[in-house]
A protein has these predicted regions:
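The feature marks the mature, well-folded catalytic cores of soluble enzymes
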Residues: 1-131
């Protein structure tokens, strides 16, 4: 466990990681990027996602795949896929919510979603997280 001495206290909304890589919000101080990379032993980059600083709120990934805000551009999706080492698909959760982390719990064994998640969303999530 590593404690980051930062003013940000909701790091889960600012960071998306798996065992292969991580995307960190530009609002996280640069001095912590190397610490995060070293502690988790992963490659880490700093970027916004679909114009949002809350990277962890608009992306969710495990070691098999991931989903991202539907307004993310293709170039960013390719870059994030490379860093995380998995395929990432645009998706929504809970009948159209683009903040995918608000309704998804995921690890490499299973994915749990909110009860408002509809059939097409479940199909997208199944495809995304079982690549």
């Amino acid at each position: 466990v590593k404690k980051l001495d930062t003013k940000h206290n909701a790091l889960g909304n600012l960071i998306c990681v798996n065992d292969k890589g991580g995307i960190v919000s530009p609002v996280v101080e640069k001095e912590f990027i190397k610490e995060i990379a070293d502690v988790l032993d992963i490659e880490v980059i700093q970027r916004k996602v679909a114009g949002f600083h809350q990277v962890g709120a608009v992306m969710k990934a495990n070691n098999l795949g991931g989903v991202i805000h539907p307004e993310a551009d293709e170039e960013d999706i390719k870059n994030f896929s490379n860093v995380l080492g998995v395929n990432i698909e645009p998706a929504t959760i809970n009948s159209g919510i683009p903040y995918v982390s608000s309704g998804i719990l995921a690890n490499s064994n299973a994915v749990v979603v909110g009860n408002l998640t509809n059939g097409p969303e479940i199909m997208t999530l199944t495809r995304a997280f079982t690549n």
